[in-house]
């Protein structure tokens, strides 16, 4: 009898031990529910922030940005810039290896920047690197990068999520297929990519930072439906979800096991007006439309309070951003200006959106109603990614059907050049970049170009302010709001958060 009890005790102990081991393993596996799918795992060939964010599982850059969008060293220890602003010399950390065992060194950096700056590779992020004349490996830990002309924002380009260090061995092995075979220096390596369902990454045992990563795996799971994404948190199917639909935020906030986070962002939402087309070529019309929109009401109706009215064309947390007195809501003034512009009865136009999710739909409906109150009839269209690529990003000024266009921009370099030049410089009309207002002002172009030729912060401040002053006065946009980024996570998950550019930070994430 005693023997039988002893055996059952051993069995019970074995079961308990197995369960404990199983739970311990499961406790280190995190599922992240995200709003859309991934296009590629090659950061240099991804136009979407989400793909670049997931690629941070595998990849690191020479530099990065912290939560305040300030520059930090990652694979680099330091850098210097020549007096003429042409040459950047970067000192690298020693003793780091890629996940395939290849040494990380100056030769590896050269291989990556040579690839990125070669137009023959047709990489989507080529515009970031087109100013590189040559990259030289001076010794194993020293890289010299020579530019074609001074470009004072270049160090921020090296901190952009696209500027990832890929194993040169893997680049040679996989070539154009590298987007399916990521090999970097990051804390995780690829486990599985089911292209219709999820990306799973696992701990890289040879990671160069001691004690990291703390998780065994992360599964990135695209969940397009807002309600399903929120429900996965409540059932425990996911430990982190982003974005959280504004209408679900209050419900999740009441759940004692979930923490809701509303983080600052650099995501500015705006409506561009095609200034090469009537009636938007008339400054009074553009001014009228800015008076016609009640931004505080828009914050409540479309964003459930998780946004702030825009105070400029560059979000406040971006370096060299200028703030102005927000446009007041004044429909009477709007009608007066329309009358002065020759449109006493208003006019008809189109209003397109770059996205078709629920928040974009609400913005379109709200704006349509606001414009109707001053006599403007707007036919609205919420586009999917394919429509946007074909009708907006892929057509030049003569072919473009863009009139009013609701969209957003996140300057992931954290610096004013990438917040201004792609959106307002004359050379950046579609299909080159994203100046969907087809705005052109020689003074603005000159100020932006001059700002890139100086490393003097005071001079850069003066030049960027001058450019923003003109843009604000000429109003090719209706600046709307700067979003707050709403995410939610299980309370036992720590160290996992959203960056201001909508990317993720998770290097020291852990489950308690």
Curated annotation (Swiss-Prot):
Residues 1-26 form the signal peptide. It comes from Shigella flexneri. Part of the ABC transporter complex GsiABCD involved in glutathione import. Binds glutathione. InterPro entries: Peptide/Ni-bd, SBP_5, SBP_5_CS, SBP_5_dom. Keywords: Periplasm, Signal, Transport. Gene3D superfamilies: Dipeptide-binding Protein, Domain 1 (3.90.76.10), Dipeptide-binding Protein, Domain 3 (3.10.105.10), Periplasmic binding protein-like II (3.40.190.10). The complex is composed of two ATP-binding proteins (GsiA), two transmembrane proteins (GsiC and GsiD) and a solute-binding protein (GsiB). GO terms for molecular function: peptide transmembrane transporter activity. One of its GO terms (cellular component) is ATP-binding cassette (ABC) transporter complex. The keyword Signal applies. It comes from the Bacteria. Belongs to the bacterial solute-binding protein 5 family. The keyword Signal applies. The lineage of its organism: Bacteria, Pseudomonadati, Pseudomonadota, Gammaproteobacteria, Enterobacterales. This is Glutathione-binding protein GsiB. Its main location: periplasm.
